[in-house]
Design a protein with these regions (language model features):
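N-terminal glycine-rich "phosphate-gripper" loop used for MgATP/nucleotide binding
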Residues: 77-81
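Rossmann-like dinucleotide-binding domain that binds NAD(P)(H)
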Residues: 186-272, 277-284, 368, 372
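C-terminal glycine/acidic-rich active-site capping loop/insertion
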Residues: 151, 240-254, 290-368
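N-terminal Rossmann-like dinucleotide-binding module
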Residues: 1-53
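Rossmann-like NAD(P)H-binding beta-loop-alpha module
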Residues: 142, 149, 155-187
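Beta-strand-loop-alpha-helix segment that lines the small-molecule cofactor/substrate pocket
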Residues: 73, 84-150
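C-terminal helix-rich "cap/oligomerization" subdomain common to oxidoreductases
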Residues: 1-3, 73-75, 141-144, 352-379
Length: 379
């Protein structure tokens, strides 16, 4: 009788991303996934995730997981200022690592105020590169896998587009990607010290990562070496012009970060990619990558899609039904989520990561993509 391989998980962080990952782990096929330990400094939050998704235990000290011989992989879903330190410790303890986006950033020195307004971007870039190079050395010497949780890579339309591009050996000439929404519910989102940047750091990294990956697929299919040669960004705070009453529908509260970003990436073959992100888009999150090549046009709609369009006269009975992300009202016409964990790429992401560990495969989204994305964000 065939016995499935087992991969044992230890997760650090019990916030929103922990739920996305735990749900993805539960959907992995062909392997036994053991959710052993969930850790958070807020033990009550860890206990909630434990009870909701079936982890065996909840703890408040993540170093306990590093010494647990049963745990194969450390899943890091903490705020990004902790990513590099925790990843290095986990790799040195012989664990594989899954790291949420973004890989890292600059968060200021202790006691530093208004980091985004006062610290030169050249200083930020230098510090970020130093931290990433330190982590890179550990990744390369550890013999363990580093998996970068960029769900755009695993969104079914993006994966399907990559398959077609590889088959035709198409030359991508221009890509446009976006992740825009109505602000953030996190109190740290408006502070550079809390997130390492604004909308570009929080959300713009998604289309950047997805488009970099697609360009890598082209390069492999065509036997070419393609790198990024130029990054030009236009960022700003578009909501400064609003009176308090004009902000009543917006969640965005920037203090020393941008709420809009527009980044143009130029590759060594002269082709372009445009990444857009805004904190001021009402009507639900906008997630897509459009690819225009020498012989094709591929429109990858991630959210919203039109698989299910809903119309409700009232909200009765829908209190626990989520229509889509950042859609407060459920009445009228909406493009409702259908199996959003799969459509947005989380299911495929965790399946690929678990297969990579169990069968010693190279993950689609690994350290090089994490490194290049962060380097572009801080360029």
């Amino acid at each position: 009788m065939f016995q499935k391989k087992t991969v044992t998980i230890g997760t650090i962080g019990a916030g929103y991303a922990a739920g996305l990952h735990a749900s993805g782990f539960q959907r992995v096929c062909g392997l036994e996934i053991r959710l052993k330990t969930i850790c958070d400094v807020r033990l009550d939050a860890a206990e909630k995730v434990k009870d909701l998704f079936g982890y065996e235990q909840a703890i408040s000290d993540y170093e306990e997981m590093l010494s647990d011989p049963e745990i194969d992989v450390i899943d890091i879903v903490t705020p990004p200022f902790l990513h590099c330190t925790m990843a290095i410790q986990a790799l040195q303890a012989g664990k594989h690592v899954i790291c949420e986006k973004p890989l890292t950033g600059y968060f200021g020195q202790k006691g530093e105020l208004n980091v985004g307004k006062n610290t030169p971007k050249s200083v930020m870039y230098r510090e970020v590169m130093r931290d990433m190079d330190s982590l890179k050395a550990v990744v390369e010497s550890s013999g363990r896998k580093f998996m970068y949780a960029e769900n755009f890579v695993y969104a079914p339309p993006v994966q399907r587009a990559a398959q077609m591009l590889r088959a035709k050996k198409s030359k991508i000439l221009y890509m446009r990607g976006e992740l825009s929404l109505n602000g953030s519910s996190s109190p740290l989102a408006g502070k550079w010290s809390g997130t390492g940047g604004g909308i570009l750091m929080r959300n713009g990294c998604h289309p950047i990562g997805g488009m970099l990956w697609l360009k890598q697929q082209e390069a492999k299919a065509r036997g070419e070496n393609i790198r990024v040669t130029s990054v030009v960004a236009d960022c700003g705070v578009t909501t400064d012009c609003l009176l308090p009453e004009d902000k009543r529908h917006l969640l965005v509260k920037p203090e020393d970060v941008e709420d809009y970003s527009n980044v143009t990436i130029t590759f060594s073959d002269g082709t372009k990619a445009l990444a857009i992100a805004s904190d001021t888009v009402l009507g639900g999150s906008q997630n897509y990558i459009n690819v225009y090549s020498s012989d094709s046009a591929l429109v990858c709609n991630i959210t919203p899609t039109n698989m299910l369009e809903s119309y409700f006269m009232d909200d009765d009975g829908l209190e626990n039904i989520e229509i889509s992300q950042f859609m407060k009202h459920k009445t009228g016409w909406n493009k409702a989520w259908v199996n959003d964990e799969f459509v947005r790429g989380y299911t495929g992401e965790l399946q690929n990561f678990m297969d990579s560990i169990a069968y010693d495969m190279i993950p689609d989204s690994g350290f090089s993509l994490a490194y290049d994305t962060a380097r572009i964000v801080y360029a």
